[in-house]
Amino acid sequence: MALTKMKDLRQLSDQEVSDRIAAIKKELFDLRFKKATRQEVKPHQFKHLRHELAQLLTLENERRRSGGQG
C-alpha cells in the first residue's frame, strides 16, 4: 500500500474528508487494540494511517482557514 498523495486528497469533498478522518481514527483504534491483545499486526499500517490522517487534517484546516478569509 503506497502513501496517499495530497493531490489525490484535494479532489475529495469536505464531507468525504470528514468521513475519511473518522474512518482512519477507527482503523487506528482497531490496530492499537489488536496490538494490545497480541494479535498479528503489520507495523507499517500505523505509519500509513497516521500519514494519511495528518494529510487529511491539514487539508481540512487549510479549507477552514481559506473559507473564513474569503
Swiss-Prot record:
Gene3D superfamilies: 1.10.287.310
One Pfam family linked to the record: Ribosomal_L29
Top-level taxon of the source organism: Bacteria
PROSITE patterns: RIBOSOMAL_L29
InterPro entries named in the record: Ribosomal_protein_uL29, Ribosomal_uL29, Ribosomal_uL29_CS, Ribosomal_uL29_sf
Keywords annotated in UniProt: Ribonucleoprotein, Ribosomal protein
Gene Ontology process terms (BP): translation
Membrane-traversing stretches: none
GO CC annotation: cytosolic large ribosomal subunit
One Gene Ontology term of the molecular function aspect: structural constituent of ribosome
Family statement drawn from the similarity comment of this UniProt entry: Belongs to the universal ribosomal protein uL29 family.
Name used for this protein in its record: Large ribosomal subunit protein uL29
Organism: Thermosynechococcus vestitus (strain NIES-2133 / IAM M-273 / BP-1)
Organism taxonomic ancestry: Bacteria, Bacillati, Cyanobacteriota, Cyanophyceae, Acaryochloridales
